[in-house]
Every structure is written in structure tokens, then in C-alpha cells.
């Protein structure tokens, strides 16, 4: 995946937008007395140059299969109503490795369409079970099992790439049930990712997790961050190559000199210096979407910081 490839696609997109703008301008100025509907058709990069798209996505998949620092993001997919394109997977950075859908219960036809593009890019898509936030919805173990059975069926039906989950530290029984059920359902190539403090997962179950996203999204200083990493890799026994650090878009992170940095980019630096660890997990990415020059500037910069030669 080279900058030339990206620039070629971006150039094509701008050309398409310019042609559309000229067409709209001509239609608007041709008759000032009548209002006329103008059809607008979005042309995806794959439709502009299919041969180049195939070459580009093959390079992306090769990159994601190579040894590199991972980038992972949560996405609240397909809300009702949708605010903008930021609500859809197709607008995520191409180099993103894993996306966890936090509204996967409402997986839409737009999500289904985007899955084709995600897999072309080699991006893995997970169904998030946010038990920590939704515990009250499950009256008992039977209700949780029924829900998990539905999750497993949805992952299979929509060709998702596995599961992510959170846990209630005061409900070890539910956590054990989630791990047992989802790890048993996981097929070859699928992932099981836990988001939180690994000490809240039974020691015997930690080996069943492919990755752990450490709950560092609210951490604001490096001293605390270092202690969290030591606890995860030491007391909890999570191998560094399985540990990702979480950071929220828009949040601050203060270094050893109490200098403020954007949490996402500074956390990316710490993935390297405190490990090397597996990678970075970005939360609240809707706060990072809009920018004058490009979408997701912080997340894109973090990906480049972690993998500058890729």
C-alpha cells in the first residue's frame, strides 16, 4: 500500500466531485424560474477503476497480514436516524485492522453492503457484546444465553469476523458464560476480543482471548498508564503482543513533563515505548471524523505513527 495508490484514488474522487459540482451548477443556472430535481449518484472507487481497486485492496490485505502494529476502533454503526457518512464502515480509514460494531444488534442493509468493502480491504468486523453497559437487560443466565445465541447466529448470517465484549467486574458468572459461549462458537479465523481490565476475567479464561483492549481510554497521565500496563502484562499475564491500549478521540493525555497531547496519537507512541504492545484501540471516533483536509485525522496519524514504513 503506497502513498501513490492512495493519492490516485483521492484524485479520482475529487475529479468525480468536481464533475458533479459543474453539472449541478449548470442545472441550477439554466432556468431560474423552475425548480428541477437533479439525480445524484455516488460513484465508489471500485466503480471508477476496478482494476486499480483490485490492486489497491490486494496491497491492503497483504499489509494487514504482515507483522505490524494493529489499529482497532469502536463504531456505533447505522444509528436511527443517521447523522452523516461517519455512521458507516465504508468511511473508516482503509488501513484500520479491526472495527467493533457497538450497534451490531441493529445491523442494517447498509452495514451488509459495507461488509463487502471491509473484506476487500482486509478489515475484520466484530460484533460487540457490551455486557457492562447492558447488564440490566438480562434478567438471568437464561436471558443472557438466549441473547448470545442470537449474536452467534447474526455473526454467521452476516459474515462477521468474530466478537468483542465487555464485562461487569462484580458478575464473574456472566463473564465466564460469555467467554465460554463465544470462544466455543468462534470459527477458524475469527477473533474474540475483551475490552477492559483483564483481571476481571478468570485466569483460566484469559488464554481464550485473542486480544485484550486495556481500559486506558479514561487515563490522563503516563504514570497511571505505565502501572496499568504492568498490571496487565504482569499480574494478569497478558502477553504484550496480545495487548492493545485504548484512547478516546478528543481526550487529553499528559506526558511525564505534564505536557498535554491528543490521547490517540500519544497513546500510539506509548504502544511502542511501553512494549512493544499489539496496538491501539480508538474510542469515540465520531469526535475525530470532521476535518478540513481529511476524515479521521487523529486516527490516521496514529496509524502512520505506528507503521511509518508500511
Language model regions located:
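Residue-level marker of positions within ordered structural domains that often coincide
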Residues: 34, 104, 285
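Chitinase-like catalytic core of GlcNAc-active glycosidases
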Residues: 66-260, 275-277, 291-293
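Bacterial Sec-dependent N-terminal signal peptides
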Residues: 1-10, 20-66
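Intrinsically disordered, low-complexity regions
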Residues: 2, 6-10, 57, 72, ...
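Generic hydrophobic, helix-prone segments enriched in Leu/Val/Ile
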Residues: 48-63, 213, 264-270, 299-305
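N-terminal secretory signal peptides and thylakoid transit peptides that target proteins
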Residues: 12-15
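Generic detector of solvent-exposed, compositionally biased contiguous segments
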Residues: 35-46, 51-54, 242-263
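Substrate-binding cleft of secreted/luminal carbohydrate-active enzymes
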Residues: 246-310
